[in-house]
């Protein structure tokens, strides 16, 4: 455990700059991820040596602070020596960071106070701190012996720092704005108290400042670059991320804050030679674990870019064991280019270390090309939801729009065989005179990637939305609108994740308490899966069991060796709510327990359809074959998955990321199992406390 100590001490700015020169040299790239022959740059750094004089006599106010603006009552900074604090700055030590902020405060005209410090519990080593303006907060007025003049105004100015793996101190959060007067008026009130501290060791001290050049206080421009002016107006370039002023700093600030609270949070920034941001990728710990569970079928949503949203967002989502959407990772891209998508997919592959079995996307040629290069063995399919949504836009101008839309829907959803689809499509384009329509022509050429009748051998886990009325909703549907700015999205991003995590946890708990009172039939199939599946997935399967009663006349029509073809008739609701009878062919192989329906419900949704259940029942089978009980829908799936992929694998003894992954997965199992009941909770808490005590004992021995 770690503790936080709050320190309330006024600190006088005690040093002044001596030199105007700032020597800058390039450091090696700080964080690079090697993927094949590519080096993907997280950030590049520059080391800046700043002369720090401690025994020089203080110069006059006019010389040091600049001119005085009589209208505003503030000093105008005409000879600014120190750059303003920025997220990404790094220092060799806490003292260097502390002295830097004091020098900056002296230059601007305010005093500094240490608001908080964080220390490790055993070693007492400081690992985090917040330095703020001395006017931050408000003093308590109760139980005071002498009333003093109030100097605090609740000023928000501050910097938050933390120690990183390199033992440097990094600025992770910055607020520059003050809510009170700065400069001359404040300077005069404190100048008599100010003393220059002389160092017996040296007359000058060097503060080494490491700044991540990818972050800036404005738009997508590197403030440290000598090419700043040259690229000042280049943010509209298709090769650069289109950011507004302060967006890049907001991104990096958010990432650093997330890493401060969660070391397994991963992000990567793609920058050009001038340090300008092009593409971004990130994934939190929960998303990475979810990908290890549910990364076999993913949906890459690029509609925010193609739809010209304010934020160039791309999301990777999957389907969890409750049949709900779960976030796997996110990215910001400079544009819809093959190069940007290729970079994003390469990073995803390197971080997640798996190739999806099925990838569903919008119709996007650059993305399609990138997928074929990075995931050559994956099945790439187009989102039927996105295609259906574009019908009004693409066909709305036709004089016979309603008739064409109706014929299009019938061809997509009501055909079971390829020959039926081809006939329905041919009727539509010839009968309504749309054979020359460019959009319909392009759809037909790519029909094998989106029409359900062609996708029956592809597993979708529910992402396909192959039935009328089903839609594939964006993960951030209620949180992101066309004009949502990036800074607002970062706030909503956390809210959306918290809500999804809470919903998943509640669903896990509810799934453990499913009882027989919720059964609606006496069918053995229903009873069987009620004990195994999560509540949400069982409810979906339960509908198929109930609809078995709308099926009748299960008839054997053909035998081919071990394969037997049955014909199942079903009363379905057709046009004008009339009941129609449709025939469904079901192939059954008793020797291996194989059953396949022509509707391909199992591949589309992950559970057997009513027609297949009727054939099993007709042949006296009382339990669903194990091959059709998918582990991904089980209420204990995470525990089973962890047993197969947990500590049994090799863990690099020098890789802290792997340590964290294994510890996180282990603890996650304890958390999920401990939330089932009060007794489970008490045992889990006891075990966690005992484990923590043992870890602390190791630390004490090392000390």
UniProtKB/Swiss-Prot annotation:
UniProt domain MULE: residue ranges: 297-392
Localization per Swiss-Prot or TrEMBL: Nucleus
Transmembrane portions of the chain: none
Residue intervals of every SWIM-type zinc finger in the record: 584-620
Protein known as: Protein FAR1-RELATED SEQUENCE 6
Region of interest called Disordered, as start-end residue ranges on this chain: 1-29
General function of this protein: Putative transcription activator involved in regulating light control of development. May have a role in controlling flowering time.
Induction: Up-regulated in hypocotyls by far-red light treatment.
Zinc keyword on record: yes
A GO BP entry: regulation of DNA-templated transcription
Entry-linked InterPro entries: FAR1_DNA_bnd_dom, FHY3/FAR1, MULE_transposase_dom, Znf_PMZ, Znf_SWIM
Species the sequence originates in: Arabidopsis thaliana
């Amino acid at each position: 455990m770690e503790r936080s100590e709050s320190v309330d001490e006024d600190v006088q700015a005690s040093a002044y700059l001596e030199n105007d020169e700032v020597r800058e040299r390039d450091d090696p790239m700080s964080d690079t991820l090697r993927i094949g022959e590519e080096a993907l740059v997280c950030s590049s750094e520059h080391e800046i040596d700043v002369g720090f004089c401690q025994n020089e006599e203080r110069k006059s106010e006019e010389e040091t602070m600049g001119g005085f603006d009589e209208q505003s009552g503030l000093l105008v900074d005409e000879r600014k020596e120190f750059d303003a604090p920025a997220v990404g700055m790094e220092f060799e030590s806490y003292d260097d960071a502390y002295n830097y902020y004091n020098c900056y405060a002296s230059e601007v005209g305010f005093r500094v106070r240490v608001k908080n410090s964080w220390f490790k519990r055993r070693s007492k080593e400081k690992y985090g701190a917040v330095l703020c303006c001395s006017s931050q907060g408000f003093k308590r007025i109760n139980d005071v012996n002498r009333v003093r003049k109030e100097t605090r105004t609740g000023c928000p100015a501050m910097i938050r720092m933390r120690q990183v793996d390199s033992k440097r101190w990094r600025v992770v959060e910055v607020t520059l704005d003050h809510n009170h007067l700065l400069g001359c008026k404040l300077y005069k009130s404190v100048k008599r108290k100010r003393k220059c501290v002389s160092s017996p060791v040296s007359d000058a001290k060097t503060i080494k400042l490491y700044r991540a050049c990818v972050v800036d206080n404005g738009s997508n421009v590197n403030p440290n670059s000598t090419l700043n002016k040259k690229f000042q107006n280049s943010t509209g370039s298709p090769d650069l991320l289109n950011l507004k002023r302060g967006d890049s700093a907001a991104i990096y600030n958010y990432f650093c804050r997330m890493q401060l609270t969660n070391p397994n949070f991963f992000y990567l920034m793609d920058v050009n030679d001038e340090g300008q941001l092009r593409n971004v990728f990130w994934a939190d710990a929960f998303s990475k674990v979810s990908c290890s569970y549910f990364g076999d079928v993913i949906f890459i949503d690029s509609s925010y870019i193609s739809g010209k949203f304010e934020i160039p967002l791309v999301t990777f989502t999957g389907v969890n064991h409750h049949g709900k959407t779960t976030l796997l990772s996110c990215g910001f891209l400079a544009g819809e280019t093959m190069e940007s998508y290729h970079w994003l997919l390469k990073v995803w592959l390197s971080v997640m270390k798996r190739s999806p079995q099925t990838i569903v996307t919008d119709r996007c040629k650059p993305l399609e090309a990138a997928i074929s290069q990075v995931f050559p063995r994956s099945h790439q399919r187009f989102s039927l939801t996105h295609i259906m949504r574009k019908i009004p836009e693409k066909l709305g101008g036709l004089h016979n729009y309603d008739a064409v839309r109706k014929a299009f829907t019938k061809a997509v959803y009501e055909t079971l065989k390829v020959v039926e689809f081809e006939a329905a499509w041919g009727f539509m384009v010839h009968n309504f005179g749309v054979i020359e329509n460019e959009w319909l022509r392009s759809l037909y050429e790519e029909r094998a990637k989106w029409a359900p009748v062609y996708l029956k051998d592809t597993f979708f886990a529910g992402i396909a939305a192959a039935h009328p009325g089903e839609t594939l909703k964006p993960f951030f549907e209620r949180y992101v609108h066309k004009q949502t700015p990036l800074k607002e999205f970062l706030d909503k991003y956390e809210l959306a994740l918290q809500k999804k995590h809470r919903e998943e946890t509640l669903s896990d708990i509810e799934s453990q308490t499913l009882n027989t009172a919720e059964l609606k039939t006496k069918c053995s199939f229903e009873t069987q899966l009620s004990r195994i599946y999560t509540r949400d997935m069982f409810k979906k399967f339960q509908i198929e069991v109930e609809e078995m009663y709308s099926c009748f006349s299960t008839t054997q029509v053909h035998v081919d060796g071990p394969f037997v073809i049955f014909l199942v008739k079903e009363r379905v609701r057709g046009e004008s709510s009339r009941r129609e009878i449709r025939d469904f062919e079901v192939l059954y192989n008793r020797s291996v327990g194989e059953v396949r329906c022509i509707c391909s419900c199992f591949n589309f949704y992950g559970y057997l359809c009513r027609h297949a259940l009727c054939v099993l029942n007709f042949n006296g089978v009382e339990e669903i074959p194990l091959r059709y009980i998918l582990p991904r829908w089980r209420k204990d799936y995470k525990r089973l998955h962890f047993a197969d992929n947990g500590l049994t694998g090799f863990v690099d003894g020098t890789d802290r990321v792997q340590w964290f992954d294994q510890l996180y997965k282990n603890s996650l199992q304890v958390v999920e199992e401990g939330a089932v009941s009060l007794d489970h909770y008490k045992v889990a808490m006891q075990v966690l406390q005992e484990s923590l005590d043992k870890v602390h004992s190791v630390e004490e021995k090392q000390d």
